[in-house]
A protein has these predicted regions:
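Nuclease catalytic cores
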Residues: 1-14
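Extended interaction regions within the primary functional domain
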Residues: 14, 28-38, 144-155
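Short secondary-structure junctions
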Residues: 14-20
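Short acidic alpha-helical/loop segments enriched in Asp/Glu that coordinate divalent cations
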Residues: 21-23, 92-93
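Active-site metal-binding core of divalent-cation-utilizing nuclease and nuclease-like domains
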Residues: 22-75
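Ordered hydrophobic segments in well-structured contexts
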Residues: 62, 66-70, 77-80, 130-133, ...
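Catalytic cores of nucleic-acid endonucleases
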Residues: 74-78, 83-149
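Non-catalytic C-terminal interaction segments of nucleic acid-processing enzymes
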Residues: 125, 134-185
Length: 185
């Protein structure tokens, strides 16, 4: 499983430091529940009774990132996603990269989520996004999907990492320490 490799890498690297890696952090699990809809919207949608709403919300109406990295000294948190997807590489067809794992990460760019990530995580600098995406699998070498992802992230190219097959855990750690750790200080 892809996620387990990343988790293992950071757990080892963070031993004896101020940093902690958490799997599926819960800070955003109930993010949407208390969001107030307008009276106009409420008049046009299904509104179950309080008991039904409470039951439905127990599982959480929010976001569950794959991981977070917390600096226990500063309290700042970087939320993260891991995306594994097939792709167009040698011996395959262009449509072999048609999965949508990379497209699903576009929700991270929603203004409301960015604001929540900044508020909860304490990363307020506009020089960086408050999340990090690590991509794995053939997508990391796919000429079409690499262009899409680079275009989407634009000047925030440090907020994603293509963990390609020829790379090691040291490459992943180097990227984190060089480009993202400073924002957790």
């Amino acid at each position: 499983v892809a996620e387990k490799d990343l988790y293992k890498v950071f757990r080892e690297a963070f031993k004896g430091t101020d940093f902690i890696l958490s799997e599926h952090p819960k800070q955003l699990k109930h993010l949407y529940e208390s969001f107030t809809l307008s009276d106009e919207t409420l008049s046009q949608i299904y509104c179950p009774d309080a008991k039904a709403m409470e039951s439905a919300q127990k599982r959480g109406w929010g976001v569950s990132p794959d991981f977070s990295i917390t600096n226990t000294r500063t309290g700042k948190i970087l939320f993260g996603e891991i995306k594994r997807q097939d792709g167009w590489v040698e011996g395959k067809k262009p449509n072999d990269g048609r999965g949508n794992a990379h497209e699903r990460m576009c929700k991270l760019f929603a203004p409301g989520l960015i604001n929540a990530y900044r508020k909860i995580g304490g990363i307020t600098s506009e020089d960086i996004l408050p999340f990090w995406v690590v991509l794995e699998g053939d997508i990391t070498r796919d000429p079409k999907r690499n262009r899409e992802i680079a275009f989407w992230f634009d000047k925030f190219d440090k907020n994603y990492f293509m963990w390609r097959p020829n790379m090691t855990s040291q490459d992943l750690l180097k990227h984190f320490y060089m480009y993202l750790r400073p924002y957790l200080e």
